[in-house]
């Protein structure tokens, strides 16, 4: 649905312009493209740089299965990369010399799946393997997972995010690897 954002907002601006002209209303309509929608940081950067300072109003939209004004609560969210570093080795000749970064990432993700039962019902933890290293016959020395950690309250997101961090650190200890935790973006809930 995100491919509809630009086309939809341009159509709305054209319709608004026609309506304003037909009623003799003077004003300026500006359309902004807001990058990084999925990581919720584009509008923050634009706001911090003063892009919206002289606006009387701002209207945004997002594709949905029905057309309505939303009064939804937008969740607090952390987006993080968990980057595991290990030691590469040949998987059939000397696997004992390797320390698998991919094993660490998998153990972390398994742990987080067990964690889901022990967090409030509105907490969501989504992940994807972003980079898993080398061919199957090589113990991978690098793996990266990307996480979205969300909740309707910032305090719950903070708690879940810390717990996910601890799973990552524990997985690194279990596999004798190391982990770098990279915060990509973070935002509070919006009501």
Task: Briefly describe each language-model feature range.
Residues 2, 21, 180-184:
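Generic structural signal marking isolated hydrophobic packing positions
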Residues 3-4, 16, 20-140:
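Histidine/acidic-residue-rich, glycine-tolerant segments that coordinate divalent metal ions
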Residues 5-9:
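Alpha-helical transmembrane segments that form the membrane-embedded catalytic/substrate-binding core
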Residues 102, 106-191:
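Metal-dependent amide/peptide-bond hydrolase catalytic core
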Residues 1, 32, 148-150:
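Short glycine-rich or small-residue beta-strand-to-loop segments that form or flank ligand, phosphate
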């Amino acid at each position: 649905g995100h491919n509809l954002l630009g086309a939809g907002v341009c159509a709305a601006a054209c319709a608004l312009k026609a309506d304003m002209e037909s009623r003799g209303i003077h004003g300026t309509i500006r359309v902004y493209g807001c990058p990084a929608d999925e990581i919720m940081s584009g509008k923050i950067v634009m706001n911090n740089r003063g892009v919206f300072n002289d606006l009387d109003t701002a209207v945004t939209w997002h594709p949905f299965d029905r057309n309505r004004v939303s009064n939804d609560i937008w969740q607090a969210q952390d987006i993080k990369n968990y980057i595991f570093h290990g030691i590469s080795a040949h998987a059939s000749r000397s696997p004992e010399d390797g320390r698998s970064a991919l094993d660490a990432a998998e153990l972390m993700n398994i742990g987080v799946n067990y964690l889901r039962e022990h967090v409030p019902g509105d907490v969501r933890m989504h992940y994807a393997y972003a980079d898993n290293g080398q061919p199957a016959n090589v113990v991978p020395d690098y793996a990266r997972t990307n996480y979205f950690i969300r909740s309707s309250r910032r305090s719950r997101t903070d708690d879940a995010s810390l717990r996910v961090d601890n799973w990552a650190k524990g997985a690194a200890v279990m596999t004798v690897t190391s982990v770098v935790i990279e915060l990509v973006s973070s935002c509070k809930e919006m009501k």
